[in-house]
Amino acid sequence: MKLYEMIRDEDVSGVSGTGPVAEVVVFDTGWTAVSFYGYTADVPNVIVYSRFSDAEKIHGHEGRTRLVERKSPAEFVGKVDWRPV
């Protein structure tokens, strides 16, 4: 399993903003979970893909988004301001 933080350099969609926008977990099976912080749209969400390449194709914004590997959750720069009730 690998942990990444999605850093958006340019927001072409105008939805998630720039800077740290999501936490990404890539499981050994290839399944990938993307958990968006929800800063600009105020709609935090989690999306699961059966392949990492699908998540990258949809959210990579043609190279305008980087994935920075994190060794532990404590290294994430972004902050989640909400918790489910």
Q: Model regions: which residues?
A:
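Acidic, aromatic-enriched beta-alpha/helix-loop junctions
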Residues: 28-72
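Amphipathic, interaction-prone secondary-structure segments
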Residues: 14-27
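A generic structural motif
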Residues: 7-9, 25, 35-37
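A structural detector for beta-sheet-dominated domains
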Residues: 7, 68-70, 83
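A short, compositionally biased
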Residues: 1-3, 27-30
